[in-house]
Amino acid sequence: MTEPDEEAVALAHTLFQAARDGDTALLRSYLNAGAPATMTNAAGDSLLMLAAYHGHAEAVQLILKHGGEANSANDRGQTPLAGAAFKGYTDVARVLLDAGADPDAGSPSARAAAQMFARTQILDLLGQ
């Protein structure tokens, strides 16, 4: 069995943390250098999912610009839009919707999450 490349693992951890923190400068640097915007962690969470779930609209926009997939689901079937709806991040939801995110994709869908947690501003964006 091949051992994982320690430098690659460290870089991945750095990028995932940058997405969680909304560190757009660091993300931009690595994405411009060719880091894949679609990379996922062990739970299937993409950079986009982590940025969306933690409420970083600018980072979400940056990742989308570099090829992040608005409707990609993690291993639990959750999409970035569902994460934003669950947490009530209207600005993030707007960015994702503008990029073509499907409010009915995933399980639970963004629409279902917004209804479940009474996120009325998100529901308004989704057209209920």
Regions found by a protein language model. Give the residues of each.
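Intrinsically disordered, low-complexity regulatory segments in ankyrin-centric signaling systems
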Residues: 1-33, 42-45, 128
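Leucine-rich solenoid repeat scaffolds
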Residues: 93, 97, 102-128
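Ankyrin repeat domain, specifically the short helix-to-loop turn at the C-terminus of the second helix
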Residues: 28-36, 61-69, 94-102, 127-128
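Start-of-repeat signature of ankyrin repeats
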Residues: 11, 44, 77, 107-110
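Ankyrin repeat boundary signal
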Residues: 38-40, 70-73, 103-106
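Conserved ankyrin/ankyrin-like repeat signature
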Residues: 26, 58-59, 91-92, 121-122
